[in-house]
Amino acid sequence: MKMERKNVWQHRNREEIESFSKEYMDFMGRAKTERLAVREIRKFLEKEGFVPIEDFAGDPMDMAVYAVNRGKAIAAFRVVDDLKKGLNLVVAHIDSPRLDFKPNPLVEDEQIALFKTHYYGGIKKYHWFNIPLEIHGVLFRGDGEEIEIHVGDKPEDPVFTIPDLLPHLDKEDAKISEKFKGENLMLIAGTIPLSGEEKEAVKMNVLKILNEMYGISEEDFVSGEIEVVPAFPPREVGIDRSLIGAYGQDDRICAYTALRAFLEANPKKSIGVVFLDKEEIGSDGNTGAKARFYLRVLRQILKIQGGPEIQNSHSMRYWKKSAVISGDVCAAVNPPYKDVHDLHNAPRSGYGVALVKYTGARGKYSTNDAHAEFVARVRQVLNERNVIWQVATLGKVDQGGGGTYAKFFAERGADVYDMGPALLGMHSPFEISSKADLFETYRAYRALLEDL
């Protein structure tokens, strides 16, 4: 009668967990930005025979198609029946907290060249000082040519860093928000002056090096997107190697497990995965959830199937026949800080995929609150498939709050449930997940894609 927690390690084959974890870590080492994540996901899809939807020319009741939105979001669908009967969907976001170059980033101060940044998403600013950093992104030159920038991800590359103030001179008892200011998040770019230059000679030398490497000028930064991320690979954590430490596990751990579940599923009805951008800053913009680019893809599928192309997304009745799993992480109980949790409703590392009925803040503001009927369906499928799960909430009532994509998909009329692994150190440069929870999340997503 009593609900008891189960430790995944005591119920699963360790070799399976380790094999899956290694492949996941390889993916995470390559997918450190949303653009790079889309590139990796696309490789997985094309390897399994998926084609861009505009190139599809086969059986409309047997489709394996995908679509990319501006290189920052991607959706894929396996259609096995009339789409108007509905589909099962897992969604996740592939953006993560980071630093972005400002539009005019390069300055010189005290004979040190620096790149100015603006932080993206909810970070603790002090996390980003005194660690090795790498940069990735694109620039468009004045002639329109696209230039990819990648520095710091190879062993032979230099890295960047943001130096902090030494403790000997940092005796003031100031607030953290005052000690670590956003304007001080500047990367060291160089210290060697360009011979013959009298003014900003170090900055000029950095520009000279960039021009030699990429053929770019300072003005080209205006039409660029350069992202700053930690310059260390995913690592196993703990003497028993049971955990994974990596940047960007919120939320690329859900993206990877959803992708694997999607590609390996044997569905009875049409299924899909949607990986979107901008979740960490409110889901705005035309690559975020509010833009609903996936609906345009679904309309194309309906048109290919011979039905009327529905112009008004609100009239998509099939959406009400669909089930959506919002794949996102939650906060695992961290022993030194467990007082922020309601421990009776908090997830633990190693105890399976976490089911989150609602997020939001205060009085459940700005959330999707999954209906009991849908929760019952999900629970039944997970239990029938022997998936180990646990319940989760985002801390004590009024402790704080947060949100996911769930509410945006619920607005279309589908039932939606938040679900994913619990992390330690979420939104830090080195988030911690359990290998066991990683594997169990994959098993949960696959079960729900197949049987909901």
Curated annotation (Swiss-Prot):
Its EC number is 3.4.11.-. One of its GO terms (cellular component) is cytoplasm. Its cofactor is Zn(2+). Keywords: Aminopeptidase, Hydrolase, Metal-binding, Metalloprotease, Protease, Zinc. GO terms for molecular function: aminopeptidase activity; metallopeptidase activity; zinc ion binding. Zn(2+) binds at H93, H168, H427. Belongs to the peptidase M18 family. This is Probable M18 family aminopeptidase 1. It comes from Thermotoga neapolitana. The lineage of its organism: Bacteria, Thermotogati, Thermotogota, Thermotogae, Thermotogales. The gene is apeA.
